[in-house]
From Swiss-Prot:
Homodimer. Present with 3060 molecules/cell in log phase SD medium. Residues 59-81, 102-147 are annotated as: Disordered. It is found in: Cytoplasm, Cytoskeleton. There is a cross-link at K39, K59, K187 (Glycyl lysine isopeptide (Lys-Gly) (interchain with G-Cter in ubiquitin)). GO terms for biological process: actin filament bundle assembly; actin filament organization; cellular hyperosmotic response; filamentous growth; mitotic actomyosin contractile ring assembly; mitotic cytokinesis; pseudohyphal growth. It holds the Pfam family Tropomyosin. This is Tropomyosin-1. It comes from Saccharomyces cerevisiae (strain ATCC 204508 / S288c) (Baker's yeast). Keywords: Coiled coil, Cytoplasm, Cytoskeleton, Isopeptide bond, Phosphoprotein, Repeat, Ubl conjugation. One of its GO terms (cellular component) is cellular bud neck contractile ring. The modification Phosphoserine is found at S195. GO terms for molecular function: actin filament binding; actin lateral binding. SUPFAM superfamilies: Tropomyosin.
Length: 199
């Protein structure tokens, strides 16, 4: 019984710890989900910008092949292409970074759900142990009541045996008294019979 109570107490403490962690992660997960939405929107926006830059780069590169363009125009367009290429590369890096952060956030969200599952399992185990403990308490009370009834019956039997022993001792005493009286009466009769014979 004490072991069950101790195990139940430990599980309650562990369940409370899991619950606290779950509440913390739940709040953090809520923030992460909001961040995920914002990052997904940023990724979409950056992807659109990236596509626009690529389209502009293609147009500029196509313009370079036009023989009618002056050399100065070509130089300017090449510089624009380089600048746009750098921006495009920066956008791609930012998109990759946001995607990595998004993946990490989703993993944390999954961990939060896993923690909730663990918390539910502990709650079920805790409930089962409480039911087992309640059942054990009921059985213990029933056993204690039966033992009490047995003790009462034993006391009654002991008193009955003691009373019977007293009755037996009383009958033995009376029997001894009757035996003595019988012997005395027999002796007296023998003496009377002897006196009659002498007459």
């Amino acid at each position: 019984m004490d072991k069950i109570r101790e195990k139940l107490s430990n599980l309650k403490l562990e369940a409370e710890s899991w619950q606290e962690k779950y509440e913390e992660l739940k709040e953090k997960n809520k923030d992460l989900e909001q961040e995920n939405v914002e990052k997904e929107n940023q990724i979409k926006s950056l992807t659109v910008k990236n596509q626009q830059l690529e389209d502009e780069i293609e147009k500029l590169e196509a313009g370079l092949s036009d023989s009618k363009q002056t050399e100065q125009d070509n130089v300017e367009k090449e510089n624009q292409i380089k600048s746009l290429t750098v921006k495009n590369h920066q956008l791609e890096e930012e998109i990759e970074k946001l995607e990595a952060e998004l993946a990490e956030s989703k993993q944390l969200s999954e961990d939060s759900h896993h923690l909730q599952s663990n918390n539910d399992n502990f709650s079920k185990k805790n409930q089962q142990l409480e039911e087992d403990l309640e059942e054990s308490d009921t059985k213990l009370k029933e056993t204690t009541e039966k033992l009490r009834e047995s003790d009462l019956k034993a006391d009654q039997l002991e008193r009955r045996v003691a009373a019977l022993e007293e009755q037996r001792e009383e009958w033995e005493r009376k029997n001894e008294e009757l035996t003595v009286k019988y012997e005395d009466a027999k002796k007296e009769l023998d003496e009377i019979a002897a006196s009659l014979e002498n007459l």
